[in-house]
């Protein structure tokens, strides 16, 4: 049975995870998402407990007396100094009491104490509320990932889409050291605007040469998406082999991450990706090995929502508009 909302908030406390929270977290996620949340381990209290004990996640918990009514987590990256934030939920009976804000504040403190240089979140675009919360805490929008959210996802039995929905990526960086970047001409202005909004100084690196190298790739079965990591110039043959491998996994979306700091001349790689159906998604800071990447995206299904995505800010709306226009542009390549 769902808890009864309080007359006041005195007994609502926010703290880091203790083992006895695990069962309440699983109950809360089920209450908010039913059985649709893609990180399946959150439905198993033992798995939640183990994930926290091993550092796979760092849970922030809100509780009312002995009942877990809120959850937010840091998900440390394996090969970077940043973390992802996610697995966010507040019991519907306790909405509008500032619980998410309190968890977010402790999340920031915890990330800093762990030595993380920042974090990012992917706000589901079925509603604008997570985007609003992220912006209020100083996060900056950098990308829109079309089709990342499966059509099976449902929030509070209210927010759902028959098509794959999108995610708005936002960052909060504690370390804003100057970057040396290779900016492709096609996307120079919007990448520069993204860095400026994030208050990250940069200068453009002189073009350099690098050997052609096969890209790495990854398949996320839970989300039905694939990713390509490109740290050196890309050949058409390597791209085709990678696409065939990911498409054989029935990836609905494929994201191509192009290193902005590793090799100086990326124009040919960007043109090759455009001709194979990849269009703009945005910038991902400190994504792999602590370096920044330009992310492009490719649709392998028409079941992707582009009309009803919710954007909270003007820049978010501008970013989505740019992405859709770039998709129309590359569609002319056939």
Predicted feature residues:
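Short amphipathic alpha-helix that is part of the acyltransferase structural core
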Residues: 2-43, 53, 61-63, 68, ...
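A conserved beta-strand-loop-helix scaffold within acyl/acetyltransferase catalytic domains
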Residues: 16-92, 218-220, 232-236, 240-243, ...
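Conserved acetyl-CoA-binding loop-helix of GNAT-fold acetyltransferases
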Residues: 90, 96-111, 121, 237-244
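Conserved GNAT acetyl-CoA-binding A-motif
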Residues: 111-125, 250-260
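Conserved catalytic-core motifs of GNAT/GCN5-like acyltransferases
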Residues: 122, 138-160, 279-291
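Conserved active-site tyrosine of GNAT-family acetyltransferases
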Residues: 130-134, 273
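C-terminal "cap" of GNAT-fold acetyltransferases
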Residues: 149-183, 289-319
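Non-catalytic interaction/regulatory modules that flank or connect domains
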Residues: 181, 187-286, 293
